[in-house]
């Protein structure tokens, strides 16, 4: 291949499209592979890009690293990775000294569990404060989620007792379990799931009915209802700091907010025959209605999980068809900030329970935190950049400078060969960096003089120099362990889906914008020679990094997994940022429980100790109390089954609409468009607006145009309905 003069631009790598011969088994060893590479591994920068956080079980070659037909990561494919590492070293801007590798600080397990409890919104279990949010969160947990919380709280209390000899609330005060300590749900899943039902039954958990009680049920509750029967499963808490709504086995959460009555767990779970298939079918159905951890736990019990080999070719990644329920699908940006905070907490609990089912524990090591800059562009936290940008544009979700990088590459670089393998002109990149730091926030930087090659280089540097990695590197070892067990790509997707939902808002929005942008680059692969695999390999050291020490083999293993995670994100970008409906259901229950707890009535305290399961089976109307309560319609003169929709920005600002089983959100929008079709400006306005569900058991919810409104109305009859513009990034 002839390389033409490119104005000082160095082509750092070129991907060969010829199929590489699979090397022998010895080539799996990272040091051997590194030795064969022309670049000395000693030249890798001191600021290592992948974290050293492997468990002992992860120190052998992963099952996904090779298939019978082709190596998933052969030496030719990894050239992009090693050359990117070398390019990172060579492009140290302005002669800046790389910080030395951070030492991993050993911490006791109790401290890690305390941090985890804080991260999932259960800091009240540590502080002892009486807050409704923590109580409401506990009231919504599924069986597997509660087992995950129970295990970590038990570890925390045991560690604190040994360390400080202080009185700490017993785990039984929260979960109402028997005198025996909680079983290890994070051990080997084979051992966990073997044995009799009595030996292996998961701990019982707290639960709310999912609806607000009426006055009658409040007044009829007595303290005697909360008494523990010697042979029963309920225990009166010895501490009132955490409200126990009920201690019963919980069925999988469905999107309609109620479990299948009288059905065993395994019958309530959707068909999982896909787990037995080694060869991915052309397309598979994907449901967001059932808790992933519950689903995989039942699959493991029935030995349904089979290994699935991961190959290099893009087409082997399964195509998923998402099952759209009558509630439609919800993007992460369609919910209010407060509700998304609850989604993050629930997602981390669910992710932990998901890995627990496989005997994998999310472990963290404490490293020295890097404080970001408070001005400029590079090395500044995303939240700081957004705070400054929102002074110019209050609705912005992705930093403006990042959007500018995208635009610059899209203008003329989408068809440029090797666009993200080019190192660019070092002198120009250094100059533009300094000017961006000094002039961008004042809107004085001249973007027209920047070439797309320099924009691509600085885009990578932007993410690489963030104070903390865009994606949490502590998840990679757990993902490696999951891959070693070789589950189907669907299981990998579920783990990744929860990881994305657990990201902070700024990271999640930036990651979504980045994956959307890279898919535009991949769409021009025939001209730019940047395939799905090329992008994932080049970006792995830029998106997953840490300044911790690590070995060569660990670096290669983690790099392979990071590249695979990016590959999955790119492949499933359109559905990864959809919020699982079972999590939205739990948020609704949390909000209902919070409203209930805020009443601060003695009768409410009694209700919290009532046997919910008996009440639901004995009185079917209880599950629909919220819908039938007179107070639910007291504040409005609108008849049952009729909603009043408000459109404050349109000429016709309000309309009463009779709902039926076929009324969709887009039908209501069409009706308003017809009523406001007097001028072209009104038509344009309605086309850019969406129907929102506001209040009741949700903060704010931008509804899917295909959502059936009568179904939404039935689970949230106290909501207000507003047509307004959808928030953009």
UniProtKB/Swiss-Prot annotation:
Q: Locations of Basic and acidic residues compositional bias?
A: 80-89, 195-204
Residues in Rho-GAP domain copies: 380-577
**Which tissues does it occur in?**
Expressed in testis. Expressed at moderate level in kidney and ovary, and weakly expressed in spleen and skeletal muscle.
Q: Which residues carry this modification: Phosphoserine?
A: 72
GO molecular function list: GTPase activator activity
Q: Where is this site: Arginine finger?
A: 421
Q: Where is this region: Disordered?
A: 20-42, 55-105, 176-236, 612-631
The GO annotation for biological process reads: negative regulation of stress fiber assembly; regulation of actin filament polymerization; regulation of small GTPase mediated signal transduction; signal transduction
The record describes the protein's role as: GTPase activator for the Rho-type GTPases by converting them to an inactive GDP-bound state.
Q: What name does UniProt use for this protein? A: Rho GTPase-activating protein 28
Species of origin reads: Homo sapiens
């Amino acid at each position: 291949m002839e390389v033409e003069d490119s104005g000082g631009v160095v082509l750092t790598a070129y991907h060969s499209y010829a199929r590489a011969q699979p090397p022998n088994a010895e080539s799996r060893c990272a040091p051997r592979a590194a030795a064969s590479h022309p670049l000395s591994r000693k030249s890798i920068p001191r600021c290592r890009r992948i974290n050293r956080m492997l468990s002992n079980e992860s120190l052998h070659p992963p099952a996904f690293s090779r298939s019978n037909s082709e190596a998933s990561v052969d030496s030719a494919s990894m050239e992009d990775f090693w050359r990117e590492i070398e390019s990172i070293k060579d492009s140290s801007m302005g002669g800046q000294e790389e910080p030395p590798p951070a030492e991993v600080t050993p911490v006791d397990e109790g401290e890690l569990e305390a941090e985890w409890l804080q991260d999932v919104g259960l800091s009240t279990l540590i502080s002892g404060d009486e807050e409704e949010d923590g109580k409401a969160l506990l009231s919504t947990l599924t069986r597997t989620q509660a087992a995950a919380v129970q295990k970590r709280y038990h570890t925390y209390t045991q560690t604190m007792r040994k360390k400080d000899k202080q009185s700490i609330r017993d785990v039984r005060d929260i979960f109402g379990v028997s005198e025996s300590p909680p079983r290890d749900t994070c051990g080997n899943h084979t051992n966990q799931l073997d044995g009799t039902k009595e030996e292996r039954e998961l701990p019982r958990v707290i639960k709310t009915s999912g609806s607000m009680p009426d006055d009658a049920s409040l007044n009829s509750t007595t303290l005697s209802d909360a008494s523990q029967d010697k042979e029963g499963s309920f225990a009166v808490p010895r501490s009132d700091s955490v409200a126990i709504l009920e201690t019963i086995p919980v069925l999988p959460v469905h999107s309609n907010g109620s479990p299948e009555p009288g059905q065993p767990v395994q019958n309530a779970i959707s068909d999982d025959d896909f787990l037995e298939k080694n060869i991915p079918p052309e397309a598979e159905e994907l449901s967001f209605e059932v808790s992933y951890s519950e689903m995989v736990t039942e699959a493991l019990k029935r030995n349904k999980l089979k290994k699935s080999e991961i190959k290099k070719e893009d087409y082997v990644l399964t195509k998923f068809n998402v099952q759209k329920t009558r509630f439609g699908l919800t993007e992460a940006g369609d919910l209010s900030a407060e509700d998304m905070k609850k989604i993050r907490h629930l997602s981390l609990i669910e992710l932990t329970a998901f890995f627990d089912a496989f005997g994998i524990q999310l472990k963290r090591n404490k490293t020295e935190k890097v404080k970001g800059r408070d001005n400029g562009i590079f090395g500044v936290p995303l939240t700081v950049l957004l705070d400054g940008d929102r002074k110019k544009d209050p609705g912005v979700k992705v930093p403006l400078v990042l959007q500018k990088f995208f635009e610059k590459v899209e203008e003329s670089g989408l068809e440029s060969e090797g666009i993200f393998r080019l190192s660019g002109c070092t002198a120009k990149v250094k100059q533009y960096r300094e000017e961006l730091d000094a002039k961008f926030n004042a809107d004085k930087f001249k973007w027209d003089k920047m070439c797309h090659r320099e924009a691509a280089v600085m885009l990578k540097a932007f993410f690489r120099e963030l104070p903390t990695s865009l994606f949490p590197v502590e998840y990679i070892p757990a993902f490696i362990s999951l891959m070693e067990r070789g589950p189907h790509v669907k299981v990998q997707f579920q783990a990744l889906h929860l990881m994305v939902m657990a990201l902070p808002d700024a990271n999640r929005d930036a990651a979504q914008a980045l994956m959307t942008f890279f898919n535009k680059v991949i769409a021009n692969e025939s001209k730019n020679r940047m395939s799905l695999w090329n992008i994932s390999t080049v970006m792995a050291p830029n998106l997953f990094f840490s300044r911790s020490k690590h070995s060569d083999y660990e670096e290669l293993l983690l790099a392979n997994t990071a590249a695979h995670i990016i590959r999955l994100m790119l492949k499933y970008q359109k559905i990864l940022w959809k919020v699982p409906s079972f999590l939205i259901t739990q948020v609704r229950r949390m909000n209902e429980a919070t409203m209930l707890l805020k009443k601060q009535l003695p009768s409410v305290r009694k209700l919290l100790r009532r046997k919910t399961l008996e009440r639901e089976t004995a009185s079917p109307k209880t599950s629909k109390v919220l819908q039938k309560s007179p107070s639910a319609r007291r504040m409005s003169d609108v008849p049952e089954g009729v909603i009043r929709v408000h459109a404050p920005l349109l000429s016709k600002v309000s309309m009463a609409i009779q709902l039926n089983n076929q009324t969709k959100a887009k039908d209501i929008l069409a009706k308003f468009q017809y009523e406001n079709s007097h001028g072209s400006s009104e038509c344009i306005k309605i086309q850019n607006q969406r129907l929102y569900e506001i209040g009741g058991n949700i903060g704010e919810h931008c509804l899917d145009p295909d959502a059936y409104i009568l179904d939404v109305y039935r689970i949230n009859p106290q909501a207000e309905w507003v047509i307004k513009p959808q928030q953009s990034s």
